[in-house]
């Protein structure tokens, strides 16, 4: 999967999960600070990423995923 399609899919998941407008979901947007997510939202986001990308995100890694760019980089790393 190309970088752009990963980012597009991540952005789409965030829009669906958080109910935010797509133009607010930028690469640097932080889930809690910029997109209004709470801790439950972030858990649900990680679960959605795991399901949609067929990956497993350990809790210690999930805590590091705070922005769109963080998630895209992590998915690229684990999908090799």
Swiss-Prot record:
InterPro entries assigned: ACP, ACP-like_sf, PP-bd_ACP, Ppantetheine_attach_site
Pfam families: PP-binding
Subcellular location: Cytoplasm
Domain of life of the source: Bacteria
GO biological process: lipid A biosynthetic process
HAMAP family the UniProt entry points to: Acyl_carrier
Stated family: Belongs to the acyl carrier protein (ACP) family.
Protein known as: Acyl carrier protein
The species this protein was found in: Akkermansia muciniphila (strain ATCC BAA-835 / DSM 22959 / JCM 33894 / BCRC 81048 / CCUG 64013 / CIP 107961 / Muc)
Lineage: Bacteria, Pseudomonadati, Verrucomicrobiota, Verrucomicrobiia, Verrucomicrobiales
